[in-house]
């Protein structure tokens, strides 16, 4: 292969690596702020067992929410139901992330974002019982467990702790 082809492949790989959602969406140094992990849970309002397709992070109203990978803001939407105020980012390479129950937005549709940019703030909008962030990762159209994507933020010991905390079978906040 030519030198130019190798440079092009390297740039594509760098773009892909910066696009993968690889950090936590809120600052969470003590790892005590997850409320509910991915999987079946008792819905806090409907009181039925339901698949929780993301991870809930409890935090104070107004806490900053960060883009977990580079991408383009696909959706900025407000609703009194469901996800409430939410942002969806298309990261390319088959990845999308959803950030729900926000109090405020810090982005607009079509805006390019970088990993670590503030995209919004913790809220209690939509079908929610307390201030928190509901965070989802989608790969090739399928919801996947977000806990497997925090590798840029956590040491192996912290990662083990996060797995343990997120596997609790408590109620979700949405």
What are the functions of these language-model segments?
Residues 26-172:
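Catalytic cores of peptidoglycan-degrading enzymes
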Residues 1-33, 37:
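Non-catalytic extracellular/periplasmic "stalk"
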């Amino acid at each position: 292969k030519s030198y130019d082809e190798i440079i092009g492949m390297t740039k594509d790989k760098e773009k892909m690596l910066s696009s993968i959602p690889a950090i936590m969406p809120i600052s969470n140094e003590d790892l005590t702020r997850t409320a509910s992990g991915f999987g079946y849970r008792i819905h806090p309002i409907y009181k039925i067992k339901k698949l929780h397709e993301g991870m809930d992070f409890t935090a104070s109203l107004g806490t900053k929410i960060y883009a977990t990978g580079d991408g383009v803001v696909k959706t900025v939407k407000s609703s009194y139901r469901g996800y409430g105020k939410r942002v969806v980012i298309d990261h390319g390479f088959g990845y999308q992330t959803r950030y729900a129950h926000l109090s405020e937005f810090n982005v607009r549709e079509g805006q390019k974002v970088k990993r670590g940019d503030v995209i919004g703030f913790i809220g209690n909008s939509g079908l929610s019982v307390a201030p928190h962030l509901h965070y989802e990762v989608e790969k090739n159209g399928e919801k996947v467990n977000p806990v497997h994507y925090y590798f840029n933020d956590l040491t192996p010991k912290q990662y083990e702790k996060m797995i343990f905390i997120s596997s609790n079978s408590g109620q979700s906040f949405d």
